[in-house]
Design a protein with these regions (language model features):
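Conserved N-terminal phosphate-binding loop of PLP-dependent enzymes in the Aspartate aminotransferase
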Residues: 95
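C-terminal helical cap(s) of enzyme catalytic domains, especially alpha/beta-barrels
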Residues: 125, 141-160
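Divalent-cation-assisted or electrostatically stabilized phosphate/pyrophosphate-binding catalytic cores
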Residues: 90
Length: 160
């Protein structure tokens, strides 16, 4: 809705010297309800800056599969309601497998939100989900704690 937001992002990227490809813009389905045309135009401008567009909480709101053919998105984030207990829920497994196939057909990556157990993580890994996030990996933390956590993870990768 703020026409200057693209310029603000451009300025921030230049100020910080950030790699444009590291910028992700997460939008929920509700962003497209009032004015889909303007939202699509805004997403294209973000993409021209190198940002990836992520559709957050997919499948929980006003989603229409036809939107996937119109929206310039890169990633679909599956809501945790599909993920919780997926290792034991065959209906959720079928749904997520279907969404994964659909995402592949459109060239989208998939993020599974709300992964809390090793069994959920393993199932998602086995079916080829691209990314996962949730308490299984880490609880929310302050920026300084995050930096220490990342540094520790890098050390573990070097050892392994």
């Amino acid at each position: 809705r703020d026409a200057g937001i693209v310029n603000q992002l451009r300025e921030l990227i230049e100020e910080c010297g950030a790699k444009r490809t590291l910028v992700d813009i997460e939008l929920t389905e509700s962003c497209f309800i009032e004015d889909e045309k303007s939202a699509i135009d805004l997403m294209r401008q973000f993409k021209q800056l190198g940002a990836r567009i992520l559709l957050d909480d997919f499948g929980t709101g006003y989603s229409s599969l036809s939107q996937l053919t119109r929206l310039p998105i890169d990633v679909i984030k599956l809501d945790r309601s599909f993920i919780t207990g997926i290792d034991q829920n065959y209906q959720s497994q079928s749904l997520v497998r279907s969404l994964l196939g659909l995402a592949r057909a459109f060239g989208f990556a998939i993020v599974a939100e709300g992964v809390e157990t090793e069994r959920e993580m393993q199932f998602l890994k086995d079916i080829g989900v691209d990314y996962a996030q949730g308490y299984f990996y880490s609880k929310p933390m302050a920026p300084d704690m995050f930096e220490a956590w990342v540094a520790d993870k890098k050390k573990l990768r070097l050892i392994a």
